[in-house]
Amino acid sequence: MSMVRAKVLAAICGAVLSLASVPGLSAAPITIAVADFDYVDTSGEARDQTAEHKLRVAKFAELVRENLSAQGDTSVLAFECPRHPCTPISMGSDDFLAAARRTGARFIVYGGIHKMSTLVQNGLVEVLDLPGEKLLLRRTVSFRGDNDEAYRRAAAFVSDTVRDAMKGR
């Protein structure tokens, strides 16, 4: 083999090997399942908004899934359960954990939203490392508004918060 050919081959091998150390290129995607979110309304408003809130909370979870999926280093897996919502409260913790494990995901994202007043809502988001049964994130969030835009902004914030908790995992 000629000296030039040997140098080219060595350079190619070095470049390929250096790619293995670039974050995001060598690691498998993080697997996450996002459960449904619970919802409680204690605002005392006269108008029944149950149907609207049910749709918004479902869309909230969908947006969190979409936002996390948009990252190339994250794979969001389906969370299946016999009936919705798929939450620790509606299913019971043992059934919820069993369903979470069936997803094959390493992490499960879950939580709930509480409408406290006409404009103020509080949420709780948790991320559990399923194999280690270790809580990695427990974050309260507060947001103003009871419309699609308020939920969209809250879902974006929650997605960013979860993504930050996953860094280096």
Residue map of PLM features:
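A short acidic, glycine-rich active-site loop
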Residues: E52-K59
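General helical structural elements
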Residues: L9-A11, F60, F157
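Acidic/histidine-rich, surface-exposed loop or edge segments in extracytoplasmic proteins
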Residues: A35-A51, F79
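Bacterial N-terminal signal peptides
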Residues: A10-G24
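N-terminal secretory signal peptides that target proteins for export/translocation
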Residues: M1-R5
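C-terminal/domain-edge helix-coil "capping" segments
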Residues: A27-T42, E62, N67-T74, L97-R102, ...
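Short, solvent-exposed, polar/charged sequence segments at loop or secondary-structure edges
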Residues: S69-Y110
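Short, well-ordered secondary-structure micro-motifs
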Residues: G44-A46, I89, Q121
